[in-house]
């Protein structure tokens, strides 16, 4: 086998590989003989079909298969010999056969050489937060509201009330599609409607008819309504006040607490809040570290890896549509290219961090991650056992652990400052509610 390597552009490489023709002819001959032994052709005894007949019937297909196998096998031998690391599947183009040799070309991309830079320039503001008694009380108040019952009242509508109404919306005096509803229910303060709609109902009583002026946001989904001033003619038919359950042992029982009553509920709430806080703190620091790593390291990305990631993201997006995908056209790659490129770059950079620091997934950390995730389920031990018995899930958890270890390794050289922050403020920002 003879090999020549050509760097065409960027990460693309072109291998020209020559293989002795006699090697291919021997493989073709051997394959024809094997086929002759098992072929069943009318007019010939089993195993006695002449090679010429087999060659006439199956020769072209057999030769094509052999050529494919030869190209694949010799390509692998060539990249090992040349110490090349392909980033995707090669494209094979068969060349000439002059009787002495068979030549073919393999084109592919290689992984870029990654040299980590600016690790000591990464800046991280590490938030410090804890769950206080007041935070637990706030959560209990939220749970009370979620379990509220409503009853009609004869007073002005206030924040937190549930109202029923009929309304008609218009822009420039003309009703618009989707702007009319009867017996519409709305909890004031829920933020379901456009700005100004809910506040415009405050202070009105059942039976009143009134008009409120609002403006559709510039980012509103309907193109014909973006940024437009609108009027809503409203007839308020009912105002319902919330009746919140008392905070006692009976309240705790609503959440499956059979022993320990209210104190047990508070302990469970605190545990869940602490778990969510820990996850959010980790995610916050990780995002800062990753952003710093990306900003300080510019690398050329293999198109093959980006294309592969685009396909993954596209499939995930289609799965979210569920049964609605049957008649949907394929989502364009452009929707996912930027995110795919970011994910590929992160993977390459973190891979180099793992390699440089000789990191291996710590078993204790892996089990800790599984236990933390399982604690959110009714039977944690069952979830832990399931993960430990599933090779694919275990590999996923090892990858998560390795990523955590890589981030921790980067933190050691980063410029880290700590900042005290209240639980509610931090979690609101983390969940996008701020």
From Swiss-Prot:
GO biological process: 'de novo' cotranslational protein folding; cell division; chaperone-mediated protein folding; protein transport; protein unfolding
InterPro entries with a match to the protein in the record: PPIase_dom_sf (IPR046357), PPIase_FKBP_dom (IPR001179), Trig_fac (IPR005215), Trigger_fac_C (IPR008880), Trigger_fac_C_sf (IPR037041), Trigger_fac_ribosome-bd_bac (IPR008881), Trigger_fac_ribosome-bd_sf (IPR036611), Trigger_fact/SurA_dom_sf (IPR027304)
Pfam hit, one: Trigger_C
E.C. designation(s): 5.2.1.8
Cell location: Cytoplasm
Main location: cytoplasm
Family in the record: Belongs to the FKBP-type PPIase family. Tig subfamily.
HAMAP family: Trigger_factor_Tig
Free-text function comment from the UniProt entry: Involved in protein export. Acts as a chaperone by maintaining the newly synthesized protein in an open conformation. Functions as a peptidyl-prolyl cis-trans isomerase.
Protein's name according to its UniProt entry: Trigger factor
Species: Shewanella baltica (strain OS185)
């Amino acid at each position: 086998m003879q090999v020549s390597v050509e760097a065409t552009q960027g990460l693309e490489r072109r291998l020209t590989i020559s293989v002795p023709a006699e090697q291919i002819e021997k493989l073709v001959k051997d394959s024809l003989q094997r086929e002759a032994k098992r072929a069943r052709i009318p007019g010939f005894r089993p195993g006695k079909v002449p090679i010429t007949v087999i060659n006439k019937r199956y020769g072209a297909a057999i030769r094509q298969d052999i050529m494919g196998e030869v190209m694949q096998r010799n390509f692998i031998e060539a990249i090992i010999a040349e110490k090349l690391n392909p980033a995707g599947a090669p494209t094979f183009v068969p060349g000439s056969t002059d009787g002495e040799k068979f030549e073919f070309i393999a084109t592919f991309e290689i992984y870029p050489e990654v040299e980590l830079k600016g690790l000591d320039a990464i800046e991280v503001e590490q938030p410090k937060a804890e769950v206080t008694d007041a935070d637990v009380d706030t959560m209990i108040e939220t749970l009370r509201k979620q379990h509220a019952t409503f009853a009609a009242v004869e007073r002005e509508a206030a924040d937190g009330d549930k109202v029923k109404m009929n309304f008609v919306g218009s822009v420039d005096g003309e009703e618009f599609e989707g702007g009319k509803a009867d017996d519409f229910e709305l909890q004031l303060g829920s933020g379901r409607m456009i700005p100004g709609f809910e506040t415009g109902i405050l202070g009105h009583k059942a039976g009143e008819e009134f008009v409120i002026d609002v403006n559709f946001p510039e980012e509103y989904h309907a193109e014909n309504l973006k940024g437009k001033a609108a009027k809503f003619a409203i007839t308020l038919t009912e105002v319902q006040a919330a009746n919140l359950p008392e905070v006692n042992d009976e309240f705790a029982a609503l959440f499956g607490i059979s022993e320990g009553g209210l104190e047990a509920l508070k302990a469970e709430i605190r545990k869940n809040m602490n778990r969510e806080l820990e996850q959010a703190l980790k995610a916050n620091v990780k995002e800062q570290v990753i952003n710093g790593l990306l900003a300080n390291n510019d690398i050329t990305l293999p198109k093959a890896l980006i294309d592969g990631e685009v396909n993954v993201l596209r499939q995930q997006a289609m799965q979210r549509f569920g049964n609605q995908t049957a008649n949907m056209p394929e989502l364009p790659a452009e929707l996912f290219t930027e995110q795919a490129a970011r994910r590929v770059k992160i993977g390459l950079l973190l891979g180099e961090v793992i390699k440089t620091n000789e990191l291996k997934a710590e078993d204790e950390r892996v089990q800790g991650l599984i236990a933390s995730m399982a604690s959110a389920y009714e039977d944690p031990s069952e979830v832990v056992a399931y993960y430990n018995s599933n090779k694919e899930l275990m590999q996923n958890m090892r990858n998560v652990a390795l990523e955590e270890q890589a981030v921790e390794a980067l933190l050691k050289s980063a410029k880290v400052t700590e900042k005290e922050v209240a639980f509610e403020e931090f979690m609101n920002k983390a969940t996008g509610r701020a």
